[in-house]
Amino acid sequence: MTTIDAVLARLSEAEQQLDDAEAPLSGWQLDPIYMGNQRLSRGDLDRVSTTRPIEVLHASGHILNVNTKALSLSGLLQSGINHPSTPLDHEGLPTGELKGPEVMMSVAGYVGFDRSLTDADAQGLQDFAKICVRAGVTTVTDLASRLSDETVEMMQIVTSAEDFSARLVPLKLFIGLSPKDLIARVGELAKLSTDRLRLGKIKIVADGSIQGFPARMRWSGYYNGAPNGLWYITPEQLSEIYHLALEAGVQVHTHINGDQAI
């Protein structure tokens, strides 16, 4: 889709198929690059519905647009917010564009976009292993799993089955823990490793994406003068994790986007 009107028309079509007037409506794969970098606002999404929460996830996965109802439910529809993750309109209220995992997760539960849905389930792992056989792949990874106790238990059961035909290497995503607690957690996970389930590694996302401008860029910055992007983890925390991980012999995979994050 190359216009905001086209996006809204498709959302309206989907909205009409929902019986519950308060049920959330979710969309994904939005990319303003194809729209002349026009930004979707809560006012735009309010044209689809003001009674149900609506969200549209960007193709980059780093930005979420929501309507006024979603902001209200999450407590973000207020003045006084002063953070680059939450752009404000001329009235000092959030525009509805939310950048980065922390602010996105604060509204996710109200719009049907719970990050736990991105974790693998048993059937998904079984089906994926069959695809691996067809492609001749023996070892696969999940590079951003929260690895909750429930998820780890599920992975243990699925990968221990005689007909599971791949080796799975999921990485613990750094979110919601201190560096020391993170290292301790992956140390505990490593003890649960088996031949077909290799645990005990870390995944860090350092900054936002270049699409939408939340990546951290060196001088001279973005071509259009947009403010520099977001650190998803402070450089000080990142350094602490690296030092602790090296001491503990833990592998860390770091995802970066902007050249300043390098």
Predicted regions and their residues:
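Acidic (Asp/Glu)-rich catalytic clusters
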Residues: 158-162, 186-197
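Short amphipathic
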Residues: 198-202
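Divalent metal-binding segments
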Residues: 1-184, 204-261
